[in-house]
């Protein structure tokens, strides 16, 4: 991919809207804008930097739209390059026509994430900040936004950089000891060297653990409604959503495909999935639905095992509980309004449970509280603390690699392995930390990261 030409893309969501923005970045961004823009004021004397100008975008003799346009010279822009923006009406046809005109006058269509990639390549941000751009856009809750903002502010990159600086100091000590063995140059004593390695390793481990602690706040948790047919899973989904989303009938097997909807539980975003009832069936379509249900149960952060309170837990439900594990299951005894004074059923020892009547709404508020607590317990998450840093999966994997290498290095030091071989280990740990911030990340990895971005960002 070329990174020194001029690119253009629609920077706002597609669809109908009041305003849409075309972003142009690169050395010819001002020339492209000049070729298309016709000012509405006779006093227009050219584009003053960082100033909106009113006019018309024309393609040849054809006026395309009434717009506001701005030019922002680099390097103090998002990409670090010269950037121009055209603010036009937000219809998809208007935006497409203006973008095509930009391409005809010297720009090319931007690839996914190419604006942010250029910001990274031009030193405007490190890789943790670049990834945080996509995380902020996709954040499912206010807490997810706050965690992404901390990375956008560079806090994760700064913490990793501080740890790497401590390793660099150790590398210098080893280099001196290896390069000047005949000189009695003071090197860290093994005990002090080990103590510093362990201190850095502990810092790396603590950072990596932030992924597990915050994953459900960053990405949202998958909560799956599962159980036998006619247990009331779809009624429960509708009750939780506060609207009719799933079809509810008295016929067994009404739900054949899974339905997934987002739900915010006091700041904790979840993806709530209603699945086909678990039973043996000769219907091919329903069989596929049951197979998908089992797959979703295997992937779920939390399984809501919905059972008919008048029947109690049956064999298939107990098997699902055993298979999923009690730590990932919240047993929901539904239809308690039909018990008619009978004793409320209970779950096996060690299992969380709650009683509801989805049809009337009784107990749904308690269920919401129970789901939130169960998700946090099942994922090992907690309420995010002030200053919490939240690495993503890729960053956590690189941190884990660094911690493993440092552990091996400590073993080498204890075994009196020669300093030059210890230096190789130390180089590997530094490289793993550099992967976190993108200082040594292979091009193929960068391609994969930025391919997940939207076009225009």
From Swiss-Prot:
A family per Pfam: MnmE_helical
Cofactor binding notes: Binds 1 potassium ion per subunit.
Residues involved in GTP binding: 230-235, 249-255, 274-277
EC number: 3.6.-.-
Coiled-coil ranges per UniProt: none
Binding site for (6S)-5-formyl-5,6,7,8-tetrahydrofolate: 23, 85, 124, 457
Binding site for Mg(2+): 234, 255
Cofactor: K(+)
Residues given in the record as K(+) binding sites: 230, 249, 251, 254
GO cellular component: cytosol
Any one Gene Ontology molecular-function term assigned to this protein's record: GTP binding
Sorted UniProt keywords: Cytoplasm, GTP-binding, Hydrolase, Magnesium, Metal-binding, Nucleotide-binding, Potassium, tRNA processing
Any one biological process term the GO annotation gives: tRNA wobble uridine modification
Domain TrmE-type G: 220-376
Subcellular location: Cytoplasm
Record-stated family: Belongs to the TRAFAC class TrmE-Era-EngA-EngB-Septin-like GTPase superfamily. TrmE GTPase family.
Subunit structure: Homodimer. Heterotetramer of two MnmE and two MnmG subunits.
Cited function: Exhibits a very high intrinsic GTPase hydrolysis rate. Involved in the addition of a carboxymethylaminomethyl (cmnm) group at the wobble position (U34) of certain tRNAs, forming tRNA-cmnm(5)s(2)U34.
HAMAP family linked to this entry: GTPase_MnmE
Descriptive protein name: tRNA modification GTPase MnmE
Lineage, uppermost ranks: Bacteria, Pseudomonadati, Thermodesulfobacteriota, Desulfovibrionia, Desulfovibrionales
Gene responsible for this protein: mnmE
């Amino acid at each position: 991919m070329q990174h020194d030409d001029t690119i253009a893309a629609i920077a706002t969501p597609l669809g109908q809207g009041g305003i849409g923005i075309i972003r142009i970045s690169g050395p010819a961004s001002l020339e492209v804008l000049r070729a298309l823009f016709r000012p509405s004021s006779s006093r227009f004397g050219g584009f003053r930097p960082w100033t909106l100008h009113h006019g018309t975008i024309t393609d040849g003799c054809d006026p395309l739209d009434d717009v506001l346009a701005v030019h922002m010279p680099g390097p103090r822009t998002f990409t670090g390059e010269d950037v121009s923006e055209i603010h036009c009406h937000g219809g998809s046809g208007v935006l497409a026509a203006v973008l095509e005109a930009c391409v005809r006058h010297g720009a090319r269509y931007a690839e996914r994430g190419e604006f942010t990639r250029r910001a990274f390549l031009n030193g405007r941000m490190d890789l943790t900040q670049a990834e945080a751009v996509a995380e902020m856009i996709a954040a499912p809750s206010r807490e997810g936004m706050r965690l992404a903002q901390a990375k956008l502010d560079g806090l994760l990159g700064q913490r990793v950089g501080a740890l790497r600086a401590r390793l660099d100091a150790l590398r210098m000590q080893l280099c001196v000891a290896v390069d000047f063995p005949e000189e009695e140059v003071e090197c860290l004593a093994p005990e002090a060297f080990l103590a510093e390695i362990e201190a850095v390793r502990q810092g790396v481990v603590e950072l990596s653990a932030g992924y597990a602690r915050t994953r459900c706040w960053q990405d949202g948790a998958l909560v799956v409604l599962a159980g036998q047919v006619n247990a009331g899973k779809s009624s429960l989904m509708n009750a939780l959503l506060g609207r009719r989303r799933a079809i509810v009938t008295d016929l067994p097997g009404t739900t054949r495909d899974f339905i997934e909807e987002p739900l915010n539980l006091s700041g904790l975003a979840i993806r709530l999935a209603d699945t086909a009832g678990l039973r043996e069936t000769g219907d091919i379509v329903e069989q596929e639905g049951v197979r998908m249900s089992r797959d979703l149960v295997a992937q779920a952060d939390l399984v809501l095992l919905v059972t008919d309170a008048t029947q109690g837990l049956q064999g298939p439900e107990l098997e699902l509980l055993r298979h999923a594990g009690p730590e990932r299951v919240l047993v929901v005894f539904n239809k308690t309004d039909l018990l008619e004074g009978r004793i409320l059923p209970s779950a096996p020892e060690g299992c969380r449970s709650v009683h509801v009547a989805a049809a009337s709404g009784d107990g749904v508020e308690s269920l919401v509280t129970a789901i939130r607590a169960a998700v946090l317990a099942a994922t090992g998450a907690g309420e995010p603390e002030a200053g919490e840093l939240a690495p993503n999966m890729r960053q956590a994997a690189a941190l884990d690699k660094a911690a493993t290498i440092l552990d091996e290095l400590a073993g080498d030091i204890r075994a009196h392995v020669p300093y030059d071989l210890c230096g190789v280990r130390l180089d590997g740990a530094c490289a793993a930390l550099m992967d976190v911030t993108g200082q040594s990340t292979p091009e193929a990895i960068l391609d994969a990261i930025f391919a997940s971005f939207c076009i225009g960002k």
